[in-house]
From Swiss-Prot:
Its cofactor is FMNH2. This is Chorismate synthase. Transmembrane segments: none annotated. It comes from Acinetobacter baumannii (strain SDF). PANTHER family: CHORISMATE SYNTHASE. The lineage of its organism: Bacteria, Pseudomonadati, Pseudomonadota, Gammaproteobacteria, Moraxellales.
Amino acid sequence: MAGNSIGQLFRVTTCGESHGVGLMAIVDGVPPGLALTEEDLQKDLDRRKPGTSKFATQRKEPDQVEIISGVFEGKTTGTPIGLLIRNTDQKSKDYGNIAQTFRPGHADYTYTQKYGFRDYRGGGRSSARETAMRVAAGAIAKKYLAEKFGILIRGHVTQIGNEVAEKLDWNEVPNNPFFCGDVDAVPRFEALVKSLREQGTSCGAKLEILAEKVPVGWGEPVFDRLDADIAHAMMSINAVKGVEIGDGFAVAGQFGHETRDELTSHGFLANHAGGILGGISSGQTIRVAIALKPTASITTPGKTINLNREDTDVLTKGRHDPCVGVRATPIAEAMLAIVLMDHFLRHRAQNADVVPPFVPIEP
């Protein structure tokens, strides 16, 4: 299973399963001298962890991260940083009924076909539980990028099911469990999720993630374009089925004279491209949006097959999110931070001595 790492110079490798002993990550490439504590990582982990809201899974995990290497006397040493989160609230018996059957819409069938068998407890390695380590690793990248460049990475939910947030107030985002910046949309989100629970079904969601003050020049054309790597990182998140950069799919109905992001000596006149031109950061705010599918873990019986390839029905038990997008914001922020950190190091490695013909224009 070779797909457990992301990044070239800032490289994150994770391991662990939903109902195993715990989750681990190795974060390689962190520059030495960064002041770093477990509390720095815990802030984002607390935003993602389960059991903190009635609108998400009721599995209660403290998600207390332990730094086991790579930090000495409060600073990074430049050696690999080892991270550990122990699982404490597994209820594997909830999954006994799917040991011989496949949950439709999940990775059960494909994991079994690929590896010959699977860890059926909570989805094993395919569970979104794994993303806790991404958030921890991403917090390191966020801290470094913020301190060195003033980069601010933040996200918010723009849509849950058919309910759409119409405005954005960043001050409202941390005040509700939906990471929503529209105070008027929150009651509608609450009512929808409550209704979904009662109906035994789920819904999808859409999120926007922004990275402000990213310097111009990051990205490695042609195959490792910055937007290509961002899309790769976002698509690696559980349940993500669509990624947009800038105006995204809306560009199909736009015209060239509307979307070309004209430049002046005082700055850009628009940002339809989402802060990336030719696969390289333009210095403008990077705008990313992701769409997450409805979780297939619902209490409505569904048709499936068993290990004998016989038709049967399955009823998913366990504790699940009625909308996985509710807790996806810190995960998406982390993945964007990991990609940006990697591209900063790659840009510095090759282009540290490059002198552009003029000072970059204002975003």
